[in-house]
């Protein structure tokens, strides 16, 4: 009879949005960054990675403008003193400053920043 068909709940398939939201892409700069800290003979050596949830274009831009972005990272680090980067809060502040500097430069070069996270894969203060 007609009532039998409705025993099975109807499956509704939702279209996946064309933008891959929440897919995070990462890029790690191949070489360390080493620079003096402000007002000190101490220097900081870091390895830096970045992340974005935008499309691959952001990572491609980071890669193709690596030289300009390295300069931005070194400039940002050299504005910090030893006291300012000690502890997790200091590292977070430094990461945010680097992110801002990278995005400003990418906006100049490509019209769009898109770097959402900056990570230190190594962090050595000497």
Task: Annotate each predicted stretch with a short phrase.
Residues 1-126:
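Flexible, low-complexity charged segments
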């Amino acid at each position: 009879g007609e009532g039998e068909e409705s025993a099975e709940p109807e499956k509704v398939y939702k279209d996946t949005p064309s933008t891959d939201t929440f897919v995070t892409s990462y890029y790690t700069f191949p070489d360390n960054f080493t620079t003096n800290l402000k007002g000190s003979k101490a220097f900081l050596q870091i390895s830096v990675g970045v992340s974005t949830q935008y499309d691959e274009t952001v990572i491609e831009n980071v890669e193709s403008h690596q030289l300009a972005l390295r300069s931005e990272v070194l400039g940002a680090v050299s504005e910090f003193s030893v006291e300012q980067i000690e502890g997790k809060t200091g590292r977070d502040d430094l990461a945010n400053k680097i992110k801002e500097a990278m995005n400003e430069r990418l906006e100049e070069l490509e019209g769009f920043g898109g770097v959402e996270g900056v990570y230190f894969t190594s962090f050595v203060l000497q």
